[in-house]
Amino acid sequence: MSRDSGNDSEVAVTHGEVQEITEENPEIGSMHITQETDISDAPETNTDSSRQRTESTTSVSSESWQNNDEMMSNLRRAQRLLDDGATPLQIIQQIFPDFNASRIATMSENAHFAILSDLLERAPVRQKLTNYNSLADAVELFKTKKHILVLTGAGVSVSCGIPDFRSKDGIYARLRSEFPDLPDPTAMFDIRYFRENPAPFYNFAREIFPGQFVPSVSHRFIKELETSGRLLRNYTQNIDTLEHQTGIKRVVECHGSFSKCTCTRCGQKYDGNEIREEVLAMRVAHCKRCEGVIKPNIVFFGEDLGREFHQHVTEDKHKVDLIVVIGSSLKVRPVALIPHCVDKNVPQILINRESLPHYNADIELLGNCDDIIRDICFSLGGSFTELITSYDSIMEQQGKTKSQKPSQNKRQLISQEDFLNICMKEKRNDDSSDEPTLKKPRMSVADDSMDSEKNNFQEIQKHKSEDDDDTRNSDDILKKIKHPRLLSITEMLHDNKCVAISAHQTVFPGAECSFDLETLKLVRDVHHETHCESSCGSSCSSNADSEANQLSRAQSLDDFVLSDEDRKNTIHLDLQRADSCDGDFQYELSETIDPETFSHLCEEMRI
């Protein structure tokens, strides 16, 4: 949890990215914790202490789409324990027994308050529906459902030439090197940082400015859902306006767009095209009236999200019969909470390059969004197949065809049984290669030997060589023990194939994952800088040659030796996202919270 931006709003920095939490958001807004001290005596919170996207306070009393009984119950229980004198660490241990509190025992109380706040705000764990699993199930859902809610992120625009944010080659990775003074990559969308230094934003803006790109297969698929009367709403986190370019009408641009701009000094309004020249030249656009900096009407951290979003979600949550998340990491609230606000029996599909540890979709289709959507379109047939043909024709006419020709028909599915047989074969081959080679026994020099001094020297060199071999073999074995063999799934996807690696996970080209032959589980490939792909301000080193970086097993607390300075209240928690390896730390915290601030923030969680 981080500081508020007013009496009616509340923010949390959890689950790897800044998340919007306000009193409009009764999941948090209904909560209340206060210490024995009068809340009126609580210190004013510092609006500069955290990045946030907050919603309009005008709809506080009317929006209740994020109610959650479990979170309410936990907060009330935390309130009682706090009133009884329990420490934040003790509260964590009692309310969240599955959380490994021993890992944070040596941290400061302020850090414990921050972690407790984050745990109380975490999105509820969604229970997977057992009757929806396979790619075929997904196709059937698209055929039969009539009120499909599609939530899209940057992944749907990658094939258009627009970089995403968190991949190894994404915008955040490049900002780290190009703007070393940037506190962290997400500061590019911090309204306070923008006012001080708009250059990083304008450096990035050129890459997604409207008018340069052709909508992707994924955009056209969503439009066809709308045309066929199946689309309830497209909630997009993107600001590239490609939904409008595609002709999608039932779209909510959750985070705004470049279509309109405003002077940050005098409020003069501009059309997005009026700053086109400056944006494409990577120059900061200035107001013609007062020379103030012009900002596109994109929702920055620290600005109102707007009322339209909440009104639509409140209406749609009761109508939706299928949720489809395409190309989003679901790390930014409140959009990330949409899958958790609908009826528990509504099936949900994830189409993304990687599995999301904080989101239990019923069906996971992992890989490049367009490759997956193409396969679904071929299965649906009719107008959906025609849109693929039309898209390919446009790309060919514009000379934008890829070196590797996209699939022209449905992919051949490697079944889960066949996949596991391949894994077992690979494991047997790997085990056989690990068998130690027999070496001849070392020969000692007999006392009565009359070998020359030269022979003695050769014998010593022979022993030394064998010892070196032993050392190398030991190192190799140790590596294999620490880092089990990973099977590259992408090698199986040639010749227009996809792989069912589990009952509910199907892998396509572009998936950022491998298969662990030891645990028989899917593991994420590491992006740039291991676990620094989100909004943490700490710097992290990346060792491309390290085998540990093959897995998403970002460092847990076991890997850290915290210095005395780290344990002070100013500690920048090295609790980065641990992804699939440690469920305790599927979020990150950017700062600590003192008890008074914790009390003040929780007071504002009530309706």
From Swiss-Prot:
Ranges where the record places region Disordered: 1-68, 426-453
Phenotype of gene-disrupted mutants: Reduces the longevity-extending effects of nicotinic acid when exposed to 1 mM nicotinic acid. Defective ascaroside-mediated responses with neither ascr#2 nor ascr#3 inducing lifespan extension or conferring thermotolerance. Reduced germ cell apoptosis in the gonadal arms following DNA damage induced by UV-irradiation. RNAi-mediated depletion results in an increase of 'Lys-16' acetylation of histone H4 (H4K16ac) on dosage-compensated X chromosomes in hermaphrodites.
Instruction: Detail which positions bind NAD(+).
Output: 153-172, 237-240, 327-329, 352-354, 369
A single GO molecular function term of this UniProt record: histone deacetylase activity, NAD-dependent
Q: What are the catalytic residues?
A: H255
Task: Write out the residues that bind Zn(2+).
Answer: C263, C266, C287, C290
Record text on cofactor binding: Binds 1 zinc ion per subunit.
Q: Name one GO cellular component term.
A: nuclear inner membrane
Its primary localisation, in coarse terms, equals: nucleus
Point to the regions of Low complexity compositional bias.
Answer: 55-64
Obligatory cofactor(s) = Zn(2+)
* Location(s) in or outside the cell: Nucleus; Cytoplasm
Q: Which reaction does it catalyse?
A: N(6)-acetyl-L-lysyl-[protein] + NAD(+) + H2O = 2''-O-acetyl-ADP-D-ribose + nicotinamide + L-lysyl-[protein]
Q: Which InterPro entries match?
A: DHS-like_NAD/FAD-binding_dom (IPR029035), NAD-dep_sirtuin_deacylases (IPR050134), Sirtuin (IPR003000), Sirtuin_cat_small_dom_sf (IPR026591), Ssirtuin_cat_dom (IPR026590)
Q: Which PROSITE patterns match?
A: SIRTUIN (PS50305)
Sequence ranges assigned to domain Deacetylase sirtuin-type in this UniProt record? 128-401
* A biological process term (GO) from this entry: cellular response to heat
User: Keywords in UniProt for this one?
Assistant: Cytoplasm, Metal-binding, NAD, Nucleus, Transferase, Zinc
User: Which Enzyme Commission number(s) are listed?
Assistant: 2.3.1.286
Instruction: Tell me the Pfam families matching this sequence.
Output: SIR2
**UniProt xrefs under PANTHER family:** NAD-DEPENDENT PROTEIN DEACETYLASE SIRTUIN-1, NAD-DEPENDENT PROTEIN DEACYLASE SIRTUIN-5, MITOCHONDRIAL-RELATED
What this protein is reported to do is described as: NAD-dependent deacetylase. Involved in metabolism, apoptosis, response to oxidative stress, response to DNA damage, and determination of lifespan. Required for a reduction of the 'Lys-16' acetylation of histone H4 (H4K16ac) on dosage-compensated X chromosomes in hermaphrodites. Plays a role in germ cell and somatic cell apoptosis in response to DNA damage. Functions upstream of daf-16/Forkhead box protein O in the Insulin/IGF-1-like signaling (IIS) mediated pathway, promoting daf-16 mediated transcriptional activation and increased lifespan.
Subunit relationships: Interacts with ftt-2 and par-5. Interacts with daf-16 following heat-shock, which causes daf-16 to accumulate in the nucleus. Interaction with daf-16 is promoted by ftt-2. Interacts with transcriptional coregulator hcf-1.
According to UniProt, the name of this protein is: NAD-dependent protein deacetylase sir-2.1
Per the UniProt entry, what species is this protein from, by scientific name? Caenorhabditis elegans
| Lineage, top ranks | Eukaryota, Metazoa, Ecdysozoa, Nematoda, Chromadorea
Gene name, please? Answer: sir-2.1
